Regions:
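Chalcogenol-based redox active-site neighborhoods
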Residues: 1-158
């Protein structure tokens, strides 16, 4: 996939380790319904915690529209596990340590900022791998889950 994935683009399948060290594929998630793939810069930082906890707190709403939430950052498997355990996340956190998936979707910042090289972006991906929506917001952490739900509710009402 070219840099800067947009609404309507098809997301290529990928495989990354989750917080338990289990290899997970995008296609595996999509087999069970649409996916909300949210990129966050760094586990255990204030903004990323607010965003990730909001996704956790809306579990019932995402279940109502048959969608799965999947977090992703450049953090190690061990740090993702610590982050998940600390906040009781009920969804997988994927480790993209070299930023390969972030690069494919255009989520890498142009300036090298070490662990903060990943932008805060969310992709709502339909079961056919087409992107339904791309959500950009570095400062409004709750917008990611809230807007993803609006898109998924509109999809469900079609």
């Amino acid at each position: 996939m070219a840099a800067g994935a947009s609404k309507g683009d098809v997301v290529d399948d990928f495989e990354l380790l989750d917080e338990t060290g289990t290899a997970r594929r995008l296609s595996e998630f999509l087999a069970n319904g649409p996916v909300v793939l949210f990129f966050y810069p760094a586990a255990m930082t204030r903004g990323c915690t607010v965003e990730s906890c909001h996704f956790r707190d809306l579990a019932a709403e995402f279940a109502e529209v048959g969608a799965q939430r999947v977090g992703i950052s450049r953090d190690s498997v061990a740090k993702q596990r610590q982050f998940s355990d600390m906040h009781g996340f009920d969804y997988p956190l994927l480790s993209d340590p070299d930023g390969a998936v972030a690069d494919r979707l255009g989520v890498r910042r142009s300036l090298p900022l070490g662990p903060l090289s990943t932008k805060r972006m969310t992709f709502v991906i339909d079961t056919d791998r087409h992107i339904l929506e791309v959500i950009h917001s570095e400062l409004s952490m709750n917008d990611h889950a809230d807007r993803a739900l609006r898109v998924l509710r509109a999809r469900a009402s079609r």
